[in-house]
């Protein structure tokens, strides 16, 4: 995909200009089967795209075989805050076994996207966020949100 050959839609450009004017980007999503909401995944693919969000610098630009190998260079969102908040539909113990892997959405976002764009990552996670949540659990979650917001 080359944005100079096939420019993104105006809506994507509008999101990008709003992000350029902001201090932080806050992404919130539910997590199903270790995947974020499809709409958010698609938004990330469109908006946080090279060369606006990051670009690559080749280690060996003149090499026929290794010219594509290099490292990311942060773009428009460099040194801003990227906040991810996800709700998991079950108790923490059911996701604990997967938490060591890089396949869970938060780690995938942090390592492959946010770090490429130079964002400082913050994370807010919830477990057992269901429609029939007890008031005590809801208040505990809201305390986490308040503490998190004050830390920014």
Indicate residue ranges for each PLM-predicted region:
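N-terminal beta-loop-helix "entrance" segment that forms/cooperates
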Residues: 1-6, 136
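Intrinsically disordered, low-complexity regions enriched in small/polar residues
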Residues: 3, 17, 34, 55-56, ...
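Extended, charge-rich low-complexity interaction segments
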Residues: 4-14, 145-152
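Helix-loop-strand module that forms the ligand-binding subsite of alpha/beta enzymes
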Residues: 6-107
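Glycine-rich phosphate/pyrophosphate-binding loop and the adjoining helix
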Residues: 93-152
